């Protein structure tokens, strides 16, 4: 007999007396022998291992107090006496965190225990055992802190779950992080995410099964393609794909052509400059021009005109701050233009003024053009996504920040541009912060370029210091006084009373359902409430009457306050002087729901007295322009807007402002790689901006619907967007601009983002194929950088073009880029849901539902019945029109990239919904979750979050079953739980072929994706087929991107095999758990289960039974244990309508094991079994699932 022997040393406290154990291993059986007790101190470490068999693999940690012996048979894990040493298996985002690099201790129960306590004797001993346990943990954590390489302690001990609160408090005092994952306790040096798939025993693994004969048919097409590949697909010359893209942007805000002959340049441009000068002077001298000049002189900016122009002439960078209404946005760019034209440099100057929003760029350009007596598109123009107006003589261009960034892709030095004005930098948008880094690097190479930064707040010093102490100038604003009414003031004067019930905002059934689902997961106070909790507790409202104080005690910080807003509006409409009302809300849901409520009001919903308008960034430009028009006499205009109305736009006739004090902004949880969309408190600067909108034309009133003490608790300024959003698109732009290392470049930002956020973004771009392992742009990445959409949506467009199913893919991408076209009126919700379900069919896809709705609208438009179609089907015609315009832009961009020639040729396979579903999967990945159908519910799990939910508006959100194993989704948002939006169900074959790279696992027939998070088990020959198809498919995409003229018909046999596989996969496989323990090895006869129990103590019976039931699609077995009079226990296990009674045993654990043993004996027919017999037992259980057999035993002994 060949033996291993080792001395084991556990975790002990100083001077503790323990027993050492000698371990003798014969093949796979383990026997333990106690040696005499030894006195061991923490400083002494046993480091000796004795191996008496050549070829044995002996591993140990020199720094930990865990010694492990691993058999040379290749077992995946090794354990000794309840201590396990293993490497953490983490998803790609969590692997980036160095905190999971090494596990110091991994304690687990050496035998299964029930979760239910029996008897009172254990409870009486809890206090003493807890103290001993905490002492042991204090030593473990001390050792963890001393060892620099070890990162965390992992325990599966039941006593540690029992004492987790105490252990967690101890860890916190020692500067460590703690979290409990189901039955596992983890203490770590690094912050811990909400979910760890490597510690999830219920993480699904997929067994893939294809219909009979499908694999052989697919293999035939594949082999035929491989045989003809060398002769059919010749080597084609490579070309730089970025060149064709760049050349296609010749008409996209290109600068003046640089003339080689300066004399010729002067001869041509001089007359044009004189012409512009003459035209400008004629306008100034005209009566209309004199009147406009007189108006402009009344603006505060005019007084600073000369000083501003002098500072710009003398400095390359100037920072200008100005209060709302001072005229900086409309006047300063004009002053520069007028100065250049007056100096006869009009034809050579080119001024670009960026705005953070489309509506701002359009409205400001129209205003400036009108002040110059011109039509838009002459000397003043604009360019935003989907539309623009500019001409040959346009010298001042207003555009969004994204437009300027896209120009930098093809014009790195901004040739011909003389001035760049970046407005609203105080908002700290991600594009604006990124643009500042790029411009800061560009200025030394362009000493003639002038940069003017404009802010609406007085934080100019921050930007001045960033640009090396650039001069900062301030324009004092002129606004009429605005009286502020905080919540306590309005309650005192109006007598309105707050109660628990009138603060429930009415979103209709849909929103109420979502809030109820979220409440199930709510375990702590919301961020809104906790942020102001201290301020409210310290507040003193003694100066107010009892009714007011009582209302304030009931005030809910989480409520937007629909009813309160309605009351304030009635107060204004009934008793206040004329003037428009601007109501600041958090987002479209709030605006739409409040608008519905107000329209149902007898006064506020009367169109003869009130004009209700909405203002949101996703609305069409024509709708947004309505807010600037003055209403008819006697009608009060009420505008419901988001925070975009703080500074970006100015509604001149606003006299009253209602401020809810909140804004819905995306924050980003880098540790869990999850965006969070929650209302948050605005900053003091934003509150002042909102208040200032009321004093434009006369003294105004501002109603802050929160107490003054809450305002005092606000942050001074808003957190930059760069620190609170995912960075994938930004990182792609950095690489496309050739700016070097992503992390190094972003470290130069005004306020650099978290390193983990950058790592997550880079890993994402690598997964979708935009970057290679060295962070270089791939051909796909170069194409993605030229498309004005998110990388995942751009990938869908490119693949749709390659595989000739572009038309529906353009519709999907356009729909995901704008607001959802499906409307959900409060009073017609059921009808709206019925209309939506009509488009969904049985495809289980929000994306294909969108395609059908759009196609129906296009058909209706051809017969001039589009409006009726939208009205009947609860669709937004404006959104559908925006989608239509965006589709045209996508087509033109792809055509310029030479990926398509005409719409007919690139949409030949648009009818193939299976192929379209595959393209959607390719774009959405790695946004994938598993779908496990249960009897009354559906369980969804993602890699970073564990269990998630679907929004009820999804076509998949209200179905009893989804007959697909996977969902790919566009977006996930954490509200209180994590919700998925815009999902499509896909099969195993679609995910394997169009998802991430697939690799072979530990044995034949085992495939892995996403670093092993997704695991698939199948026949080895089928695994080879998937690997071969995936390899050829990736090569096809690569060749097409490098050589856009490549004829895809050469790959017809390959595409036939792929289309056949994705269309005929019937999802006949199943999810299993713990499948690695059942890995296919050569069948070897074992002893019967009874003998196995004797040798191993029955430790595996409960686990084995659990695995069998899971594979057969049953729930977990239920154990009922009863204590008998003779201090023995008897247990009964129940599953699938079957009860099995075990024999009396000395402990509860052994009683449950014996009951599991009886169940396994029955399933095996009391015969000898092999590992292959597990499949037979699973099939037996599946048959029993449809029948309710007689119970094996129903009486207690």
Swiss-Prot record:
UniProtKB keywords: ATP-binding, Helicase, Hydrolase, Nucleotide-binding, RNA-binding
UniProt-listed Gene3D superfamilies: 1.20.120.1080, 3.30.160.20, P-loop containing nucleotide triphosphate hydrolases (3.40.50.300)
SMART domains linked to this entry: DEXDc (SM00487), HA2 (SM00847), HELICc (SM00490)
Catalytic activity: ATP + H2O = ADP + phosphate + H(+)
Positions that bind ATP: 322-329
Domain Helicase ATP-binding residue range list: 309-476
UniProt entry tagged with the keyword Transmembrane helix: no
GO MF term list: ATP binding; ATP hydrolysis activity; RNA binding; RNA helicase activity
Broad class of enzyme this protein falls into: hydrolase
Domain Helicase C-terminal, residue spans: 564-738
Matching SUPFAM superfamilies: dsRNA-binding domain-like, P-loop containing nucleoside triphosphate hydrolases
UniProt-listed Enzyme Commission number(s): 3.6.4.13
Motif window: DEIH box: 423-426
Pfam families to which the protein is assigned, alphabetical: DEAD, dsrm, HA2_C, HA2_N, Helicase_C, OB_NTP_bind
Entry-linked InterPro entries: DEAD-box_helicase_OB_fold, DEAD/DEAH_box_helicase_dom, dsRBD_dom, HA2_WH, Helicase-assoc_dom, Helicase_ATP-bd, Helicase_C-like, P-loop_NTPase
Family to which the UniProt record says this protein belongs: Belongs to the DExH box helicase family.
Protein name: DExH-box ATP-dependent RNA helicase DExH3
Annotated organism of origin: Arabidopsis thaliana (Mouse-ear cress)
């Amino acid at each position: 007999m060949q033996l291993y022997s080792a001395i084991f040393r556990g975790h002990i406290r100083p001077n503790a007396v323990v027993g050492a154990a000698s371990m003798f291993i014969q093949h796979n059986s383990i026997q333990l022998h106690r040696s005499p007790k030894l006195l061991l101190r923490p400083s002494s470490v046993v480091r000796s291992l004795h191996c008496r068999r050549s070829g044995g693999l002996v591993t140990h940690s020199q720094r930990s107090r865990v010694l492990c012996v691993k058999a040379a048979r290749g077992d995946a894990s090794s354990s000794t006496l309840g201590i396990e040493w293993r490497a953490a298996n983490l998803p790609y985002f969590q692997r980036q965190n160095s905190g999971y690099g090494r596990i110091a201790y991994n304690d687990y129960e050496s035998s299964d225990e029930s979760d239910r306590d029996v008897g009172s004797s254990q409870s009486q001993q809890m206090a003493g055992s807890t103290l001993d346990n905490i002492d042991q943990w204090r030593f473990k954590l001390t050792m963890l802190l001393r060892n620099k390489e070890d990162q965390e302690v992992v325990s599966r001990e039941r006593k540690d779950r029992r004492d987790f609160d105490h252990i967690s408090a101890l860890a916190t005092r020692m500067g460590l992080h703690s979290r409990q994952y189901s039955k596992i306790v983890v203490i770590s040096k690094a912050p811990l995410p909400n979910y760890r798939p490597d510690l999830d025993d219920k993480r699904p693994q997929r067994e893939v099964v294809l219909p009979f004969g499908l694999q052989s048919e697919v293999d035939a097409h594949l082999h035929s393609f491989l045989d003809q590949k060398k002769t059919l697909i010749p080597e084609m010359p490579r070309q730089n794909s970025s060149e064709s893209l760049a050349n296609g942007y010749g008409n996209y805000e290109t600068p003046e052509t640089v003339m080689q002959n300066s004399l010729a340049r002067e001869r041509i441009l001089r007359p044009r400059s004189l012409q512009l000068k003459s035209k400008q002077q004629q306008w100034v001298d005209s009566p209309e021009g004199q009147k406009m000049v007189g108006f402009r002189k009344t603006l505060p900016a005019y007084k600073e005109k000369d000083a501003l122009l002098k500072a710009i002439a003398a400095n390359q960078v100037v920072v200008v701050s100005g209060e709302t209404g001072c005229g900086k946005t409309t006047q300063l760019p004009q002053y520069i233009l007028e100065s250049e034209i007056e100096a006869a440099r009009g034809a050579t100057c080119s001024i670009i003024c960026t705005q953070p929003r489309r509506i701002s760029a359009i409205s400001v350009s129209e205003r400036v053009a009108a002040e110059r007596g011109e039509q838009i598109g002459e000397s003043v123009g604009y360019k935003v996504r989907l539309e623009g107006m500019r001409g040959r003589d346009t010298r001042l261009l207003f555009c969004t920040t994204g437009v300027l960034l896209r120009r930098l892709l093809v014009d790195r030095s901004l040739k011909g541009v003389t001035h760049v004005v970046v407005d609203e930098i105080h908002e700290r948008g991600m594009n604006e912060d990124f643009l500042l880094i790029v411009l800061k690097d560009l200025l030394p190479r362009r000493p003639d370029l002038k940069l003017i930064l404009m802010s609406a707040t007085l934080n100019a010093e921050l930007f001045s210091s960033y640009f090396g102490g650039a001069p900062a100038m301030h324009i004092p604003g002129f606004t009429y006084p605005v009286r502020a009414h905080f919540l306590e003031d309005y309650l005192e004067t109006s007598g309105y009373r707050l109660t628990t019930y009138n603060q429930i905002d009415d979103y209709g059934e849909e929103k109420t359902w979502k809030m109820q689902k979220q409440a199930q997961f709510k375990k702590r106070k919301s961020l809104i409430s906790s942020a102001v909790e201290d301020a409210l507790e310290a507040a003193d409202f003694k100066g107010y009457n009892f009714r007011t104080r009582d209302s304030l005690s009931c005030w809910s910080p989480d409520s937007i306050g629909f009813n309160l807003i309605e009351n304030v509006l009635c107060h204004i409409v009934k008793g206040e002087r004329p003037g428009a009302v601007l109501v600041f809300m958090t987002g479209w849901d709030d605006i739409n729901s409040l608008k519905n409520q107000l329209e149902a009001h007898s006064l506020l919903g009367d169109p003869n007295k009130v004009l209700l308008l909405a203002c949101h960034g996703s609305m069409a430009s024509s709708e947004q322009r309505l807010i600037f028009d003055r209403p008819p006499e006697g009608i009060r205009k009420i505008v419901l807007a988001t925070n975009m109305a703080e500074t970006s736009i100015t509604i001149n006739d606003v006299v009253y402002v209602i401020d809810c004090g909140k804004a819905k902004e995306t924050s980003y949880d880098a540790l869990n790689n999850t965006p969070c969309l929650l209302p948050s408190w605005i900053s003091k600067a934003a509150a002042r901006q909102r208040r200032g909108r009321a004093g434009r034309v006369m003294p105004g009133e501002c109603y802050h619907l929160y107490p003054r003490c809450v305002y005092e608790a606000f942050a001074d300024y808003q957190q930059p967007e760069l620190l609170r959003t995912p960075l994938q698109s930004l990182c792609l732009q950095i690489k496309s601009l050739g700016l070097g290392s992503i992390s190094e470049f972003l470290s130069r930002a005004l306020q650099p983002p978290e390193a983990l956020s950058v790592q997550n973004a880079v890993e994402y771009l690598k997964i979708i194929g935009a970057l290679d392992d060295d962070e270089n742009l791939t051909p796909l990445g170069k194409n993605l950088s030229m498309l004005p959409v998110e990388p995942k949506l751009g990938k869908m467009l490119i693949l749709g073009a390659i595989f000739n199913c572009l038309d529906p893919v353009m519709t999907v991408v356009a729909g995901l880029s704008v607001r959802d076209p499906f409307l959900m009126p409060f009073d017609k919700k059921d009808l709206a849901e019925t209309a939506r379900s009509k488009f969904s069919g049985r495809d289980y896809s929000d994306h294909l539902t969108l395609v059908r709705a759009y196609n129906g609208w296009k058909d209706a438009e051809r017969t001039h019945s589009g409006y009726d179609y939208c009205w009947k089907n609860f669709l937004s015609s404006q959104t559908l029109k925006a989608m239509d315009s965006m589709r045209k832009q996508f087509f033109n961009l792809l055509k310029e990239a030479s990926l398509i020639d005409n719409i007919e040729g690139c949409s030949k396979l648009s009818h193939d919904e299976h192929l379209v579903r595959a393209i959607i999967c390719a774009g959405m990945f790695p946004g994938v979750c598993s779908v496990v159908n249960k009897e009354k519910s559906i369980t969804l799990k993602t890699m970073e979050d564990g269990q998630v939910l679907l929004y009820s508006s999804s076509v998949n959100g209200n179905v009893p079953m989804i007959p697909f194993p996977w969902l790919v989704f566009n977006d996930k948002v954490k509200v209180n739980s994590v919700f998925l939006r815009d999902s499509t169900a896909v099969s195993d074959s679609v995910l394997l072929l169009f998802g991430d790279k697939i690799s072979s696992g530990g044995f034949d027939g085992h495939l892995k994706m996403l670093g092993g998070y997704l695991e698939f088990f199948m026949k080895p020959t089928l695994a080879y087929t998937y690997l071969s198809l995936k390899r050829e498919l990736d090569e096809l995409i690569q060749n097409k991107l490098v050589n856009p003229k490549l004829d895809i018909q050469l790959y017809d046999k390959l595409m036939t095999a792929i289309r056949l596989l994705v269309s005929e996969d019937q999802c006949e496989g199943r999810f299993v758990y713990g499948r690695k323990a059942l890995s296919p090895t050569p069948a070897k006869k074992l002893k019967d289960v009874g003998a196995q129990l004797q040798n191993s103590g029955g430790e595996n019976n409960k686990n084995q039974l659990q695995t069998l039931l899971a594979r057969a699609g049953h729930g977990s077995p239920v154990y009922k244990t009863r204590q008998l009079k003779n201090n023995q226990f008897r247990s009964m296990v129940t599953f699938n309508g079957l009860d099995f009674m075990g024999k009396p045993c000395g402990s509860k654990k052994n009683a449950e094991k014996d009951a599991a043993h009886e169940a396994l004996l029955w399933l095996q027919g009391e015969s000898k079994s092999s590992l292959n017999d597990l499949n037979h037992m699973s099939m037996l259980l599946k048959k029993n699932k449809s029948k309710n057999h007689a119970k094996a035993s129903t009486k207690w002994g």
